[in-house]
């Protein structure tokens, strides 16, 4: 038995599947374009030590890369800020956040149609940052925590909820935990 072509084209499941697939494609293309954009920005960065690079074309520090994560620092970073920023970014690497965040984004892309997935991804990114902050400051004095908080807050970009690139950390920065420890 064959199904007439007209019935197949009007099948609601085909329409729903097409819309879902378009949503997945849009989110994955967004990730790819973001990746290429950041890659171009850091192309001329200069290695200063190990996996730490300095770059004139970025405004905030971040980690970039899945197989070989690198820490990128803006050239405008002051010497007193570097210790805290590098400690934060190295905590991301130790926690393997550079693997977890892209995995979370893939799940978000697949389940984009569920509003709870949007919320879950936003909270996931926030929790990654908060867990990283907790790890860095757990044995620090109150004064060190305050200094750390102020440094990280200086990179906060208001009005951004989802990070600019699903494969990078810190380019927007949700630093709510920092406020708690001041």
Identify the residue ranges that each predicted region occupies.
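Membrane-embedded and juxtamembrane structural elements of multi-pass membrane proteins
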Residues: 4-181
């Amino acid at each position: 038995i064959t199904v007439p072509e007209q019935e197949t084209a009007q099948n609601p499941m085909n329409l729903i599947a097409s819309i879902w697939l378009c949503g997945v494609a849009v989110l994955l293309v967004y990730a790819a374009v973001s990746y290429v954009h950041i890659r171009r920005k850091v192309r001329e960065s200069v290695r200063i030590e190990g996996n730490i690079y300095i770059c004139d074309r970025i405004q905030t520090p971040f980690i970039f890369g899945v197989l070989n994560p690198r820490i990128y620092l803006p050239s405008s970073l002051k010497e007193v800020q570097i210790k805290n920023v590098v400690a934060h970014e190295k905590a991301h690497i130790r926690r393997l956040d550079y693997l977890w965040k892209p995995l979370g984004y893939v799940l978000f892309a697949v389940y984009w149609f569920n509003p709870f997935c949007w919320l879950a991804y936003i909270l996931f990114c926030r929790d990654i940052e908060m867990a990283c902050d907790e790890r860095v400051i757990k044995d620090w004095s109150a004064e060190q925590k305050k200094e750390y908080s102020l440094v990280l807050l200086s990179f906060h970009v208001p009005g951004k909820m989802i990070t600019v690139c699903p494969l990078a950390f810190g380019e927007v920065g949700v630093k709510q935990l920092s406020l708690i420890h001041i």
